[in-house]
């Protein structure tokens, strides 16, 4: 699809859309949609994974202040388990775009596929490193989800959620095996599902 856009500059009424949290074993998948204001530039936008936590936090506040419109949305653990992670992510992206206070003329989606939207959309592979609005969306989503994981870490101590943010690190997998899944763990993900299968195996009767 020929978009006729200069990815290095802010385009009027173009929404960037990105997600954070497809890979973790627990918690919601969080998405964001952002329409930047060409008259109010934000310096230093980049893929959220390439920025320090302090820089992400500062940019998140600047994006909220300067963007023409922004919306953070989500799909909950129950939706992920019911729909699968791909469809839940598409649902959360749609919610983010539909939640914008300004209707975009085009939505650019990070990745290789688009959700079903009422506005024209196009996927952009590695868009968070190419399109400023997608980079802004990745920052909002990352900061929002990381903050949620700090809250969940306090609610479910022992899993190290504040450190690894729910991703399947060795520390998380060890804690999961030792403590068992919590209500925020995704039952449809193999490491969690396999643990539940082991727990549900009935013991052999003793003679």
UniProtKB/Swiss-Prot annotation:
- The UniProt entry lists the main location of this chain as cytoplasm
Membrane-spanning residues where? Answer: none
| Catalytic class of the enzyme | hydrolase
Q: Which GO terms describe its molecular function?
A: manganese ion binding; RNA binding; RNA-DNA hybrid ribonuclease activity
Give residue ranges for domain RNase H type-2.
12-201
Pfam families per UniProt: RNase_HII
Per UniProt, which keywords does this protein have? Cytoplasm, Endonuclease, Hydrolase, Manganese, Metal-binding, Nuclease
SUPFAM superfamilies, per the entry = Ribonuclease H-like
Q: Which GO terms describe its cellular component?
A: cytoplasm; ribonuclease H2 complex
Biological process (GO) annotations held by this record are: DNA replication, removal of RNA primer; mismatch repair
* Catalysed reactions listed for this entry: Endonucleolytic cleavage to 5'-phosphomonoester
- Reported EC number(s) for this entry are 3.1.26.4
Instruction: Quote the subcellular location field of this record.
Output: Cytoplasm
Give binding positions for a divalent metal cation: 18-19, 110
Cofactor(s) this protein cannot do without:
Mn(2+); Mg(2+)
Q: Which domain of life is it from?
A: Bacteria
Q: How is the cofactor bound?
A: Manganese or magnesium. Binds 1 divalent metal ion per monomer in the absence of substrate. May bind a second metal ion after substrate binding.
Function description: Endonuclease that specifically degrades the RNA of RNA-DNA hybrids.
Q: Which NCBIfam families match?
A: PRK00015.1-1, PRK00015.1-3, PRK00015.1-4
Record-stated family: Belongs to the RNase HII family.
* Protein name according to UniProt: Ribonuclease HII
Q: What organism is listed for this UniProt entry?
A: Azotobacter vinelandii (strain DJ / ATCC BAA-1303)
This protein's encoding gene: rnhB
């Amino acid at each position: 699809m020929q978009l006729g856009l200069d990815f290095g500059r802010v385009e009027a009424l173009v929404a960037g859309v990105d997600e954070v949290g497809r890979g973790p074993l627990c918690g919601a998948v969080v998405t964001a949609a952002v329409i930047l204001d060409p008259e109010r530039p934000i310096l230093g936008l980049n893929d959220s994974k390439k920025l320090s936590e302090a820089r992400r936090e500062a940019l998140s506040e600047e994006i909220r202040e300067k963007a023409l419109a922004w919306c953070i949305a989500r799909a909950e653990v129950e939706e992920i388990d019911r729909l699968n992670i791909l469809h839940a992510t598409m649902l959360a992206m749609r919610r983010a775009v539909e939640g914008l206070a300004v209707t975009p003329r085009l939505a650019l989606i990070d990745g290789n596929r688009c959700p079903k939207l009422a506005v024209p959309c196009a996927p952009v592979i590695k868009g968070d490193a190419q399109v400023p609005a997608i980079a802004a969306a990745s920052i909002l989503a990352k900061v929002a989800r990381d903050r949620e994981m700090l809250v969940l870490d306090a609610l479910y101590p022992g899993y190290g959620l504040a450190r690894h943010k729910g991703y399947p690190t060795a520390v998380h997998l060890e804690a999961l095996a030792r403590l068992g899944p919590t209500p925020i763990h995704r039952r449809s993900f193999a490491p969690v599902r396999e643990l539940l299968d082991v727990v549900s195996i009935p013991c052999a009767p003793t003679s």
